[in-house]
Amino acid sequence: MRKGEVGFVLVVVFLLLGFSSASTDDKYQRWRKSMFSPYSTATSSLLINRAGSSIVFPIHGNVYPTGYYNVTLFVGQPAKPYFLDLDTGSDLTWLQCDAPCVQCTPAPHPLYRPSNDLVICKDPICESLHAPGEHKCENPEQCDYEVGYADGGSSLGVLVKDVFAFNYTNGVRLNPRLALGCGYDQLPGTSYHPLDGILGLGRGKSSILSQLHDQNLVRNVIGHCLSGRGGGFLFFGDDLYDSSRVVWTSMSSDYTKHYSPGVAELFFGGKSSGLKNLLTIFDSGSSYTYLNSQAYQALTSMIKKELTGKSLKEAVDDQTLSLCWKGRRPFKSIRDVKKYFKTLALSFINGRTKTLYELTPEAYLIISSKGNVCLGILNGTEVGLQDLNLIGDISMQDRMVIFDNDKQMIGWIQANCDRLPKSRTMYM
């Protein structure tokens, strides 16, 4: 999903069009990369099993006011930089592409010039992006795609393979050939941001992580650390954290399209809201957190009740987010207001055990440009999420969030996200 207030709930429909024939509102932003360089003599099977075999990417951006996080990937020969919106809620990575481009949005770099290495229609990566029974190969020599996002944006294109440039944390260079989308017809959504494309980090076979894992180059583990001060880092691999210090919960076996811990119970100030069975997903493609209409109304009622008699008054003139409050003077940081707000928590049930994911005020509030405090939790039902509940970037800040696809676990640990990791000891 991607980015801002509505992460990408991705609808993938492959149209099998001929490659040559294919002739913003910040309040509701969309929820929306030869194997080794000549300098390396190590084999992939050795690298994946030793320390330093993770790949780390610096992250740029913030929840507010930028409204999204992005990373830089280097693609092609010679390698060229592209800024991509990182999205754990969708699978396919794509770049705006000169194929030629029918419709492309303004971007920070020149359009990607695709290689001549087309992904054929019967390739497993192409098949993975079709619903069962809907994979029809009208043109068997290529894999055409159309992806649509909940903010109304879309990308139409064709899958190609090209060389990506990565570095392991031990310094070894890595140049795998991976599939990506060459998007030659883009329709911007309501949350359009000037980027070169989307970095799909979901659980599907087409994701960059899955492709690297299938080539035995990294563990099937992804994580990110988003700083509340802006920036952070993204990583592939499992040697940057001490697993014994991480809080873990199981991935749902009933909801396999996204990184979901299953259903949750909502707590406010240590007390149950009475709302249970809230189907929840983690999604870096959403700047903000979403609750279904019933949970959202219950939460806002509890917050308003808690603020009764206090010096905060609702700021109806501040349209930064759906609900804002003002004080006697403008606020400069969450520290100025956190005494008025209680900790929220989602309790995930795994068999007989329960795991709490706590949200301190820093994890669900922002200070607007007007100096008011605004609730960074929104009504997901109103923006098309129906009953789905979504943990967005605001609620994942200043902690390492880990998605271990090998063990089917989701984990988190408080962390300093301002520094790129060199070893797991930095999180002790």
Question: Which residues are covered by each model-predicted region?
Answer:
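Beta-strand-rich binding-surface signature
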Residues: 68-72, 81-85, 92, 144-146, ...
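N-terminal zymogen propeptides
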Residues: 2-65, 109, 115-118, 125, ...
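Membrane-interfacial loop- and helix-cap regions that link adjacent transmembrane helices
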Residues: 272, 309, 313-318
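Eukaryotic endomembrane system proteins
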Residues: 158-168, 174-247, 253-262, 280-283
